[in-house]
Amino acid sequence: MDSQRNLLVIALLFVSFMIWQAWEQDKNPQPQTQQTTQTTTTAAGSAADQGVPASGQGKMITVKTDVLDLTINTRGGDVEQALLPAYPKELGSNEPFQLLETTPQFIYQAQSGLTGRGGPDNPANGPRPLYNVEKEAFVLADGQNELQVPMTYTDAAGNTFTKTFVFKRGDYAVNVNYSVQNAGEKPLEVSTFGQLKQSVNLPPHRDTGSSNFALHTFRGAAYSTPDEKYEKYKFDTIADNENLNVSSKGGWVAMLQQYFATAWIPRNDGTNNFYTANLGNGIVAIGYKAQPVLVQPGQTGAMTSTLWVGPEIQDKMAAVAPHLDLTVDYGWLWFISQPLFKLLKWIHSFVGNWGFSIIIITFIVRGIMYPLTKAQYTSMAKMRMLQPKIQAMRERLGDDKQRQSQEMMALYKAEKVNPLGGCFPLIIQMPIFLALYYMLMGSIELRHAPFALWIHDLSAQDPYYILPILMGVTMFFIQKMSPTTVTDPMQQKIMTFMPVIFTVFFLWFPSGLVLYYIVSNLVTIIQQQLIYRGLEKRGLHSREKKKS
């Protein structure tokens, strides 16, 4: 019997299945409903209820910092385009990655303003405000650490509204400050809002992962409250008018894609309403509306919110808002992926190469797990030593399965052998492999990260398939060096073709993940030889492999 070997095959297949399932769940997550009120509001009703009108024509102004290149529409003050100069669109390209976009093919905008009964963005008060600006281009100059972009609007009643975007050097968090001067004789009720809207369907120029299932990650909306730290909300769910309606203090709303995110973070002590809406024409939205504020006659009111528009850099996002770093979605194994990434990042601070960091972390992980590996091989060796007795027992008892089972368990007990002893270490190792997959797919630091020679992007597949082939070779050597008692011809064929099957399967995996597996296999070969030498001294192993 070679149950441990069969368990290894099952374990590898299970890992592969879990990765595939993770991909499916990331593409199509189930909406979380325990903290939401499901509604079936129409698209027009949703927008009107939230006091968020559609944008109109205005003048476009540009804002450039060292990390952001934005285009803002003076009609409403919405951010309609966002380029990230520090992140190329593709490996080797001089074209910056575009996060926000407003074109006939695709809409992705960050809207904000003031609603409420007296708010200029309230549809009942007419078209959205057309702000005045002192110039059309703003640039963060060398030596300048902060850039302010003020926009002003005065309504028919003489009330003045100022919307100021505040940019800081090296920062993807943009503060949006509001100043409301009440020139009337009655209190003015206003409420800040922030909304992210996006086309559901991706055009070809944005669907970068369409040719590789391993590169698909979650794309959709998300929100956070003190009760629900991080909840996804699928675009298709919003498009079906199953909308979110949550009231909470604090929190944020966001739209996510692989490596990048946008988020609105309200900055107030009151209650915010988080919502989603189907805006029609294949466009969905997630946003917040803050608790109204009364500005007394002759007084000036101040409000603020924060927009994150950029890469998912965990430490920076955590500093902007609680749990915003959870948008780096490591899936259900986040509690393993996060420590692994912190360790990987710490190693990288010394070696300066993410590929070598993966190699080192593989040695560390496998070193920590060596006692489990040794226990696994010892258990498998003991099981092999019992095979003659088990075979004799089966011949003696014939087809009496019940007695076979009883005597086999008695034999295991007498010999102090746990038949599942070789399985537990495999079960423990599987989450490590899956967690590393999540880490590679979700960490912006590994995007376009080179290793050596032909590997220029550890988050992408090997363009020449050399690493998957090397992985298959190492798997073949492990198989050949492992003792076996398999006698069934079908099982023998399956075991023979396992390296080939997994080589084909790994062709489309991120090269960083395949690199981890190669190094892990090499460590297995080394540990295997060390363990076998110890087992030989105990009479539990022979260098002469049994013929099948």
Curated annotation (Swiss-Prot):
Enumerate the Gene3D superfamilies for this protein: 2.70.98.90
Instruction: List the membrane topology term(s).
Output: Multi-pass membrane protein
Q: Which UniProt keywords apply?
A: Cell inner membrane, Cell membrane, Chaperone, Membrane, Protein transport, Transmembrane, Transmembrane helix, Transport
Which pairs of Cys residues are joined through disulfide bonds in the record? none
A GO biological process held by the record? protein transport
Membrane-spanning regions, if any?
Answer: 6-26, 350-370, 424-444, 458-478, 499-519
Q: Which domain of life is it from?
A: Bacteria
Task: Provide ranges: composition bias, Low complexity.
Answer: 29-42
Instruction: Name one cellular component (GO) term.
Output: plasma membrane
> Where found?
Cell inner membrane
Annotated segments matching region Disordered: 28-56
* The protein's assembly and partners: Interacts with the Sec translocase complex via SecD. Specifically interacts with transmembrane segments of nascent integral membrane proteins during membrane integration.
Query: What family does the database annotate?
Result: Belongs to the OXA1/ALB3/YidC family. Type 1 subfamily.
Q: What does this protein do?
A: Required for the insertion and/or proper folding and/or complex formation of integral membrane proteins into the membrane. Involved in integration of membrane proteins that insert both dependently and independently of the Sec translocase complex, as well as at least some lipoproteins. Aids folding of multispanning membrane proteins.
Output this protein's name. Answer: Membrane protein insertase YidC
What organism, scientifically named, is this protein from? Salmonella newport (strain SL254)
| GN (gene name) | yidC
